[in-house]
Amino acid sequence: TEGPYFYIPMSNATGVVRSPYEYPQYYLVYPAAFAVLGAYMFFLIIFGFPVNFLTLYVTIEHKKLRTPLNYILLNLAVADLFMVIGGFTTTIYTSMHGYFVLGRLGCNLEGFSATLGGMISLWSLVVLAVERWVVVCKPMSNFRFGENHAIMGVTLTWAMGLACTVPPLVGWSRYIPEGMQCSCGIDYYTRAEGFNNESFVLYMFVCHFSFPLVVIFFCYGRLLCAVKEAAAAQQESETTQRAEREVTRMVILMVIGFLVCWLPYASVAWYIFTHQGSEFGPLFMTIPAFFAKSSAIYNPVIYICLNKQFRQCMLTTLFCGKNPFEEEEGASSTKTEASSASSSSVSPA
């Protein structure tokens, strides 16, 4: 059922469909489902805010972390905080009421904040992959990665994020409640006259999903080849084999993290867009949307907490200046010293 600035995934033959801006949507799913949604968002806030905020705090406290290669990791933490503060808190409030109680303006603000955080996070992963490829594989022999390049990378993520999130505010597509109607996203559901949704959805899939996916696969594929070549050149010693396994594991985690975050959402959105009028339940889009939002937790774990340097500094901060695991960390890093150039450049290892 399509209405002014909303789309309910349910036929109105019985006359029960109501505007998600004005009435509870308990006819879509059981009221308990809204409580589960609110609890899940609370879980994301409780875990997502501290780990991302701690990343920023630890970087401010430890000067050795303020290197150009780490700028993009900080940007990733900022993007995740943007999602937590601008999107998750709103969804908790609306799920408690069972509908998008904040109205049309609130929908625009929530949709913009959550989508901007998600897009900046996505493009941060792209820039991170490119930076690692440039540093490890050295496609430009005389190139030296510096602060200006890092700032350019961060600026690119915000520019691409805004290029995706501003158009729906000015008439190219729009933000509408989605799934259980408690959070807002880009309109993949309708071809409403005057909004040019078709062209915007194609633009999103080509420029903000397919292209980033190709870049990430290319960069990490080349990086794995470079690490294997370096290990072979050192005659496959135990230390180089261990470093190679670590880098391979981290690359696989990075790619899986990206796919888990964005592939379900993109696939379902594309299906809905290409099957206009087909029947689907409210959970059909709700679950993939919150797969994407859960990246606020597992992005920091993959890219920051598993980074040896960040992890050591984080433990030092948490334990008031002393890392109780310092001996183990030091022993581990000594064992892989022979291949530190390759593994540290990949960074999350």
UniProtKB/Swiss-Prot annotation:
InterPro entries registered for this protein in UniProt: GPCR_opsins, GPCR_Rhodpsn, GPCR_Rhodpsn_7TM, Opsin, Retinal_BS, Rhodopsin, Rhodopsin_N
Lipidation (S-palmitoyl cysteine): C320
Gene that encodes it: rho
Domain of life assignment: Eukaryota
Residue ranges with Low complexity bias: 331-349
N6-(retinylidene)lysine modified-residue sites: K293
Transmembrane portions of the chain: 34-58, 71-93, 108-130, 150-170, 200-221, 250-271, 284-305
A biological-process GO annotation: G protein-coupled opsin signaling pathway
Phylogenetic lineage: Eukaryota, Metazoa, Chordata, Craniata, Vertebrata
Intervals, Extracellular compartment: 1-33, 94-107, 171-199, 272-283
Site label Plays an important role in the conformation switch to the active conformation, positions: E110
SUPFAM superfamilies, alphabetized: Family A G protein-coupled receptor-like (SSF81321)
Cellular localisation: Membrane; Cell projection, Cilium, Photoreceptor outer segment
Protein name: Rhodopsin
KW Transmembrane (keyword) present: yes
One function term, GO molecular function aspect: 11-cis retinal binding
Cytoplasmic-side positions: 59-70, 131-149, 222-249, 306-349
Membrane-related topology note: Multi-pass membrane protein
PTM comment, free text: Phosphorylated on some or all of the serine and threonine residues present in the C-terminal region.
Function: Photoreceptor required for image-forming vision at low light intensity. While most salt water fish species use retinal as chromophore, most freshwater fish use 3-dehydroretinal, or a mixture of retinal and 3-dehydroretinal. Light-induced isomerization of 11-cis to all-trans retinal triggers a conformational change that activates signaling via G-proteins. Subsequent receptor phosphorylation mediates displacement of the bound G-protein alpha subunit by arrestin and terminates signaling.
Residues glycosylated per entry: N12, N197
Keyword Metal-binding (UniProt): no
Protein keywords: Cell projection, Chromophore, Disulfide bond, G-protein coupled receptor, Glycoprotein, Lipoprotein, Membrane, Palmitate, Phosphoprotein, Photoreceptor protein, Receptor, Retinal protein, Sensory transduction, Transducer, Transmembrane, Transmembrane helix, Vision
